[in-house]
């Protein structure tokens, strides 16, 4: 069974009527812990990466090209019901490309479809929705833009071994709260970086605060240890003072404000490439 990764809002804002209005949702991390199986996969990839680096055989990675299918699932054709515009979608793709380009990852919008379904729009009947809407192969990214995810801003699934048309194959992809797209109404989280963050999980990354101050953390050697998720943009935060480095508050895999996000690390780039090559690059179904 795959693992769903959540960004949780601590308080729900009242639903807007008519045109969308600015809302504020402070949020906490509610991510399910990676399974033992997935952690073992990550450990094995980390060991391979370290061995290759020690032998000096790390090679330049060709650009990873990801086809993206947007599925806008709304309760009506009103923006406040999740019916985002094509401009918001195009701006979201541009945001992703700006964030991932330094790591040789490129996203191409391959298609957008709109569905009016009040149940699916609030994350009801997830598997049925995805069986009806999913497109492409396991190397193609499906983004489901929904009106409401309960307390969540978004969730995604880690890469793993799947067979075509299995439930795990259908579940793959990310569900994103509509007003986190660029131009959305969610204060502090409306520049499109909820998607940037969630797609990091789609590439196999954990949160920077995975594991806290002890152990292997997120299994990436160049992300400083972090006791818990950040809130806002707390410059100088050092939640693991006995460990090297300040908290990586600007890292896309923390939970900072969108305006605070700036980077993935070199180690995260290597990990995304490893997971891509292992599970997605050669997918034909």
Swiss-Prot record:
Which Cys residues form disulphide pairs? 233-260
Record SUPFAM superfamilies: Metalloproteases ('zincins'), catalytic domain
Query: Which processes are annotated in GO (biological process)?
Result: proteolysis
The GO terms describing molecular function are: metal ion binding; metallopeptidase activity
**Glycosylation, residue list:** 282
Q: Which residues bind Zn(2+)?
A: 197, 201
What Gene3D superfamilies does UniProt report for this protein, alphabetically? Answer: Collagenase (Catalytic Domain)
Q: Which UniProt keywords apply?
A: Disulfide bond, Glycoprotein, Hydrolase, Metal-binding, Metalloprotease, Protease, Secreted, Signal, Zinc
Catalytic residues as annotated in Swiss-Prot or TrEMBL: 198
Tell where it localizes: Secreted
In the record, which residues are listed under signal peptide? 1-18
Task: Explain the purpose of this protein.
Answer: Secreted metalloproteinase that allows assimilation of proteinaceous substrates.
Name of this chain's protein: Extracellular metalloprotease NCU07200
Organism of derivation: Neurospora crassa (strain ATCC 24698 / 74-OR23-1A / CBS 708.71 / DSM 1257 / FGSC 987)
């Amino acid at each position: 069974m795959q693992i769903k990764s959540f960004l949780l809002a601590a308080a729900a804002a009242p639903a807007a009527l008519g045109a969308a209005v600015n809302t504020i949702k402070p949020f906490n991390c509610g991510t399910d812990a990676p399974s033992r199986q997935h952690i073992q996969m990550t450990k094995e990839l980390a060991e391979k990466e370290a061995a290759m680096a020690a032998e000096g055989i790390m090679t330049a990675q060709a650009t990873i090209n990801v086809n993206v299918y947007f599925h806008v699932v709304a309760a009506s054709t009103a923006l406040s019901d999740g019916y985002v515009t094509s401009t918001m979608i195009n701006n979201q793709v541009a945001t992703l490309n700006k964030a991932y380009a330094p790591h040789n990852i490129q996203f191409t919008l391959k298609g957008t479809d709109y569905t009016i379904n009040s149940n699916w729009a609030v994350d009801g009947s997830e598997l049925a929705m995805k069986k009806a809407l999913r497109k492409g192969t396991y190397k193609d990214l499906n983004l489901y833009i929904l009106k409401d995810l309960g307390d969540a801003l978004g969730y995604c699934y880690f890469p793993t071994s799947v067979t075509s048309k299995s439930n795990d194959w259908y579940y793959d992809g990310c569900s994103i709260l509509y007003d986190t797209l660029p131009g959305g109404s969610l204060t502090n989280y409306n520049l499109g970086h909820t998607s940037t963050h969630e797609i990091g999980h789609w590439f196999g990354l954990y949160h920077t605060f995975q594991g806290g101050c002890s152990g292997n953390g997120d299994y990436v050697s160049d992300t400083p240890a972090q006791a818990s998720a950040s809130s806002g943009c707390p410059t100088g935060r050092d939640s693991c003072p006995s460990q090297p480095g300040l908290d990586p508050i600007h890292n896309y895999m923390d939970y900072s404000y969108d305006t605070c996000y700036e980077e993935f690390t070199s180690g995260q780039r290597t990990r995304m490439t490893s997971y891509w090559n292992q599970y997605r690059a050669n997918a034909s179904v």
